[in-house]
Design a protein with these regions (language model features):
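Conserved beta-strand hairpin/beta-sheet module of binuclear metal-dependent hydrolase folds
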Residues: 1-50
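Active-site environment of divalent metal-dependent phosphoester hydrolases
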Residues: 10-12, 31-33, 60-66, 94-97
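A generic short-segment signal for beta-strand/edge and adjacent turn/coil regions
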Residues: 23, 53-60, 121-131
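Structural recognition of the beta-strand scaffold that forms the well-ordered cores
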Residues: 17, 23-27, 53-57, 85-90, ...
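Active-site metal-binding motif and surrounding structural segment of the metallo-beta-lactamase
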Residues: 35-89
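Generic detector of contiguous secondary-structure segments
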Residues: 13, 50-55, 146-149
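Flexible, acidic/histidine-containing loops and adjacent segments that form or flank the divalent-metal
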Residues: 1, 69-161
Length: 161
């Protein structure tokens, strides 16, 4: 197993690459992270016949989701960059939210492409994924993940703590 830390400035983006062809993407950094660092690496993995078993979005701050949005826009329904089996989000999908309660979150870093992230964006991201054939939290029947949840895979398991 190899953990690749993708250059994301103050953001987060990691790819776990197993020798047996399995891969996991954790967070997407900023949109510039995707364009400059993540996309070329995902295309490389795809050229080697690898797939993303899981794309995990830990939370909806700008420095985690902006690159993820760009990735899914590029990948599209036909999964042109790399095949994705399942998306795991830690989000609002199972929580009722009034539009008046939505508070935008943004990062203000010099030289970084800034987009705002909010619960509205989260809801839109999740809906877009589902509408384009990317299952969300399938291992939990679409419900939010909680500490203690475990995904058992062929050769490994993931425990959320």
């Amino acid at each position: 197993m190899r953990v690749r830390i993708i250059k994301a400035r103050s953001g987060d983006c990691f790819v776990i690459d197993f020798e047996n062809g399995h891969c996991i993407l954790i967070d997407g950094g900023y949109s510039n992270t995707y364009k400059a660092e993540l996309k070329p690496y995902l295309e490389y993995l795809n050229s080697k016949g690898k797939v993303l078993d899981y794309v995990i979005l830990t939370h909806y701050d700008e420095d985690h989701i902006a690159g993820m949005i760009k990735f899914f826009e590029d990948n599209g329904e036909k999964q042109r960059v790399i095949p994705v089996k399942e998306v795991i989000v830690n989000g609002f999908s199972s929580v009722a939210c009034d539009d008046n309660d939505v508070k935008p979150v943004s990062a203000h870093k010099r030289g970084i492409d800034i987009q705002k992230a909010s619960s509205k964006q989260e809801y839109s991201f999740e809906n877009w994924c589902m509408d384009n054939g990317y299952p969300i939290n399938r291992f939990k029947s679409g419900k939010s993940i909680i500490a203690g949840d475990i995904i058992d895979c062929e050769d490994y398991s993931i425990k959320f703590a």
